[in-house]
Amino acid sequence: MRAETQTIKMTEASSPTPVLEMRGISQIFPGVKALDGVDIALYPGKVTALIGENGAGKSTLVKILTGIYRPNEGEILLDGKAVHFHSAQDAIDAGVTAIHQETVLFDELSVGENIFLGHAPKGRFGLIDWKTINERARILLEQLESTIDPTIRLKDLSIAQRHLVAIARALSVEARIVIMDEPTAALSRKEIDDLFRIVENLKRQGKAILFISHKFDEVYEIAENYAVFRDGKMVGAGTLATTPQDEIVRLMVGRDVTNAFPKQAVTLGPTVLSVRDYSHQTEFRDISLDLRKGEILGLYGLIGAGRSELCQSLFGITRPASGEVTLDGQPLTIRSPEDAIRAGIVYVPEERGRHGLALDMPIYQNMSLPSLTRTSRKGFLTAANEFALARKYAARLDLRAAALSVPVGTLSGGNQQKVVIGKWLATKPKVIILDEPTKGIDIGSKAAVHGFISELAAEGLSIIMISSELPEILGMSDRAIVMREGLMAGQFERAEFSPEKLVRAATGNA
């Protein structure tokens, strides 16, 4: 009997017949066995949580299930009959649809076009029926309790709204199996509640749902069953109602994670960055803050509070309407990201795949991009210098990769985050802004990233850390600023921290 390949067992009363089974699935890449004989079963009307550290094999399983990869070994059964997915369309035709962590949408298309791309309703003479597209899109969005206009372009939406469009797109296909890969990563609590109401409705319709999340509170709230992957194997499966969280953590990482927030005590130095009366035309106003040498300043708030917009302005992505910025006591005017980088301010964005990385390029080139003047000789790039720079920061960050020449897109989320941080550290900054630094990262990798952030602060780097995860703010920050609707709603020293204080400030419930 192999403990690594347990199939989820359900009581006969709940649902004796799985709609989908994967048996003995193995996926082999050059030098790597990404999946090793895993079994999993999904049942109608039930949510199964797929849990594991980044690199455990979850993404590979999803790609097999959605027809992107064909397994080297094993079989997929749909209603007890073997099926073979040769393409993503084969999987869709069989009733399998996916909502991915990084929204795969098109900025220049309308919301309705994105929802029905590839399966647009057509009218007479085979022409696309735009009226029907927009009507159906509006109905789907209303089911998600969203008032997004289907006719506007996607690029005009916020990250949270983009995720709702991605969910609507998945629901636009008549699916029996719905895969949700970190669907709540950019959603507010209200939007998560709305999504979970949708999930409950899908369960009542008999949909089988595979739910991938690193947020244990969400897993226990929405799922009935779980399957834990580690190092390409299934190491545990069962019913969440009878399994404590500590047991799942041990299965995930193969060890106890006792210190998720390894914050080092640091003697803070002088003020490095000072912002006064800083305002944007629409996103934030009257922001004043100071950041000291070696300090981790947490920015907390709900989605849409203006935190990312503030930091993007400090990095030169957008222009402020008014206000002053000083760095090391000297006035600073930032008109572009180049100005910020030259001054020593860098920004690690929330959406790594869209703004932080060139996913098709190798690791070493991604890491050296902001430091081309240091890796070139007489105006010409040298691969040797690029590799040397990448090796230095890959070692420092404990980057897990087969080689520095592999595309960044092949890495797990945690390792992609290390590449983004590494490329900016190579510029030797004074201030680093981390926007949701552990978004989509598993619990083991989170602890590693937190440890590294703490080390950077201990070395004297000044850090602004945006996070929507309250435990992360409380565990890692020396000081926390709460924003609400573009304004500063509160500022707290570490000794004053409490979850209640920060949540009240963020929600306006005094």
Curated annotation (Swiss-Prot):
Q: Which UniProt keywords apply?
A: ATP-binding, Cell inner membrane, Cell membrane, Membrane, Nucleotide-binding, Repeat, Sugar transport, Translocase, Transport
Catalytic reactions on record: D-ribose(out) + ATP + H2O = D-ribose(in) + ADP + phosphate + H(+)
* Residues reported to bind ATP: G52, E53, N54, G55, A56, G57, K58, S59
Q: What class of enzyme is it?
A: translocase
The cross-references to SMART domains, in alphabetical order and at most eight, read:
AAA
Question: Where is the protein localized?
Answer: Cell inner membrane
Query: From the UniProt record, which GO molecular function terms apply?
Result: ABC-type D-ribose transporter activity; ATP binding; ATP hydrolysis activity
Top-level division of the source organism's lineage: Bacteria
What sequence ranges are listed for the domain ABC transporter?
20-256, 266-510
Q: SUPFAM superfamilies recorded for this chain?
A: P-loop containing nucleoside triphosphate hydrolases
Give the protein family.
Answer: Belongs to the ABC transporter superfamily. Ribose importer (TC 3.A.1.2.1) family.
* Annotated function: Part of the ABC transporter complex RbsABC involved in ribose import. Responsible for energy coupling to the transport system.
What protein is this chain from?
Ribose import ATP-binding protein RbsA 1
